[in-house]
Amino acid sequence: MEIGTARLSEDLLAQFPHHLIGIREVPEIFSVGDFCTLARFHINETLKRERIPLLVGGTMFYFSALLRGIPNLPAADPALRERLAHEVRQSGLDTLYRRLQKMDPVSANRIDPNDRQRILRAVEINILSGKQVSECEHSDGLDKTGVNVSRISLSVSDRRTLHRRIDDRLRQMIDAGLVDEVRGIRSRYPQSRGMPAMKSVGYQQVWSHLENEVDEGQMIADIATATRRLAKRQLTWLRHERGVTWFDASSQGLVSSVSRYLNAADISIMGH
């Protein structure tokens, strides 16, 4: 998975070493617990070398778990899960999602309305624990270790500019061979459509196209819509985060502004 994830080129990866890229195959599960364990290992190794780890990415749930710890959640209940799945089959996923919005609006706001697996799990947690997911006790995260984690985020103030950039990036991915990339994955792992990796924006829409469920034009429109929704959820999440320093992504002096901020700050770990 390279084109749809905007993976850096091998030259850039050689010039700027990254961790946790390309470490799993498509059918393999990579849980938030797996991520936190590996991320903390590489963070500690980087700090031992007296360097500042830079955490870069867009998966806010994983970043939050790394900072605050992983919620101590109740184990899955197969009988309850099947009951909820039956409800979805009978009434549709949107009905269960609306139920989640009433039970746990914070979690609902963070979950894609089409993400069946996460919606089922969130409702299950609320029922089993009697609490919202955010109210469950957390294991220790980086925020409790004494390190200074500085958070920065980039914003695009004009929504039209943001949507234009999304459309431009989508066209670049299509031109770079996104459809062929998914076709290759589908050929190697024909049973992987339901895996978390294939639910990523872009991959699931292309898979639908390859199954002749939608034509190319609809596929492109669906990817654009899903990407805009994802961007909106990410911005909503970040706006509720405490201690985030914002920079205008359209600013001509963006690089120098961020550099000045980094040089002036007392930072142990940098999150972006």
Predicted regions and their residues:
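Phosphate/pyrophosphate-binding catalytic cores of soluble transferases and nucleic-acid-acting enzymes
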Residues: 1-272
